[in-house]
Amino acid sequence: PARLKFLKSDNYEALLIKRIVQKFSLSFLDIEFNLFIDDKKTFQSSVIKEKSWDEKLLLRSTKVLGEDCLDNSIKISEKSEKFLIRGLLGIPTFNFSNSNNIFFFVNNRIVSDKSITSIIRVAYRDFLAHDRFPQLVLFVDCSSSEVDINVHPMKHEVRFRDLPSLKSLIINSI
């Protein structure tokens, strides 16, 4: 925050920082991340060499999300004319009370877009209770002409030129 008075407790701010480092860790699989808070290592992710992108993502996701991710996720990789989506989908029985375990990336950029979260909720609606959220690590790759990143000052939100096509691809894949 721009002003000291808007800072939360030290523990909460440390949690937010750790979450950002974890998101970057998922986005950049070929980079090692180490986070120290008060001289204690609170997060570490090593570089995994000579593995496929899918294997690297699974190992890194296990580091970020825990061992349960390994047994409760399904790999996804689907392509349309404009979009490539890939990542890990949590099985419906492995769900949460909030959306903290939904990680969404567009061209490796961390995105927290409510429209994408609602698309994911629609895709899971027949499998999850209304107040539950899946675990999901989803990457969308597309041409830069298909996405506008200048919607939000911090670039968290994006707008897609052909959102219906992306929505259809995500829903059909899930």
Predicted segments with their positions:
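N-terminal phosphate-binding caps/lids of nucleotide- and nucleic-acid-binding domains
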Residues: 1-174
